[in-house]
Amino acid sequence: MNRAYGKMLGVGRALGGRVVTNRDLEAVLDTSDEWISTRTGIRERRFVAEGQSCVTLAVEAARRALEHAGVPGASVDLVVCATSTNPESMPSVACLVGEAVGAAGVGAMDLSAACAGFAYAASVAGAMLASGLASRVLLVGADEMTSIVNVRDRSTGILFGDGAGAVVLDRGDGSSGFVDHILGADGRMAPLGRAGHPGDGKRPLYQNGREIFRFAVRMFPEMVEKIMARNGISLDEVQYIIPHQANARIIQAAARKLEVPEEKLVVNVDRFGNTSAASIPLSYPDIFDGLEPGKYIITVGFGFGLTWAANLYRI
C-alpha cells in the first residue's frame, strides 16, 4: 500500500453573505428560474456582502477549519491558498490568512490555476508534507467571482458565486492522506476562457461555454479512470468523487460515462453556484463526519488555461 500524506484534521467554509436566487436574477436579466436550473442545475448562489472579500472569506474558512481540527494556527508551518481573485497583486492571500490565524512567520503562498486551483494546491500541500518540508499545512481555496464577472451578463452572471473552503492537513503516519495526483494544462486552449484582474470592469470574465463543456465532460472521467488505474483501485473502494462544481450538467454527463452511483458524487453547485477554486473544499464539511477509514476520495478540477487536476486521498 502506498504511503499517504496529508491527513485531514479539520475543515471549514465561508460563503458570501448575500443569497441570490434565480428569481432574483429574473428581475435584472433576460432569463428565468426554469432556464437557469435546467441548463446549470443552479438554484441559488452567494455573493459577497458589504465588508466581505476573497481575503475575508479565506480567513473565515481557515479559522473554522482550525477550530474544527482543535489545533492553533501557530501549529501550522505552511499556508497554501488557491485563488484567482486576490483583490491586490500582492501580498498574497495566504500571507494575510497566516497572519490572521496566528501563523505569521511560516511559509505562505498563493497558487493560481483557475477552477482547477484547489486540486493543484492539494498536490503542492501533499508533496510538501511527503518531503518533510512541512508537517502541518493550512490549505485554502477562495474566490470572489463577482469581482471578475459581469453579473448582468446572462451567459456568465447566472453561474458564479463567492466562497472559501479550508482544510488542515497533518503529515500523519502514512496511513491516511493524499496518495497520488494528476496535473495537466494546455495553453493552446487559453482563448476559451479569460478574465481581467478583480475589479477591472473593462475585461469581465468570458468563456466559450460550449467548448469548455465538451472539454470537461471528456476530461473529468478520463482523470478519474486514470488515477484509479494507476493505483489499482476500483469504484467500489471510492467513497466520494468531488468534482469542481462548474455546472450540474457536466457532473451528470461525466457520471454517466463513469457509471458512478449518485450517492458517490458530492454536489453543491445547486446551492453555491460555481465558486472556482473554492468549490471542492466547500464540499468537505458536508461529508467529513461520515468518512469511512480505508476508503478513497477522488477530487477533480478543471478550468481556464485550460487546466485540469485530480487527487486521490485515502481516508
UniProtKB/Swiss-Prot annotation:
Its EC number is 2.3.1.180. InterPro entries: ACP_syn_III_C, ACP_syn_III_N, FabH, Thiolase-like. Keywords: Acyltransferase, Cytoplasm, Fatty acid biosynthesis, Fatty acid metabolism, Lipid biosynthesis, Lipid metabolism, Multifunctional enzyme, Transferase. Residues 245-249 are annotated as: ACP-binding. GO terms for biological process: fatty acid biosynthetic process; secondary metabolite biosynthetic process. GO terms for molecular function: 3-oxoacyl-[acyl-carrier-protein] synthase activity; beta-ketoacyl-acyl-carrier-protein synthase III activity. GO terms for cellular component: cytoplasm. Its main location: cytoplasm. It is found in: Cytoplasm. Gene3D superfamilies: 3.40.47.10. The keyword Zinc does not apply. Pathway: Lipid metabolism; fatty acid biosynthesis. SUPFAM superfamilies: Thiolase-like. The active site is at 115, 244, 274. Belongs to the thiolase-like superfamily. FabH family. Catalyzes the condensation reaction of fatty acid synthesis by the addition to an acyl acceptor of two carbons from malonyl-ACP. Catalyzes the first condensation reaction which initiates fatty acid synthesis and may therefore play a role in governing the total rate of fatty acid production. Possesses both acetoacetyl-ACP synthase and acetyl transacylase activities. Its substrate specificity determines the biosynthesis of branched-chain and/or straight-chain of fatty acids. HAMAP family: FabH. The last Arg residue of the ACP-binding site is essential for the weak association between ACP/AcpP and FabH. Homodimer. This is Beta-ketoacyl-[acyl-carrier-protein] synthase III. It comes from Rubrobacter xylanophilus (strain DSM 9941 / JCM 11954 / NBRC 16129 / PRD-1).
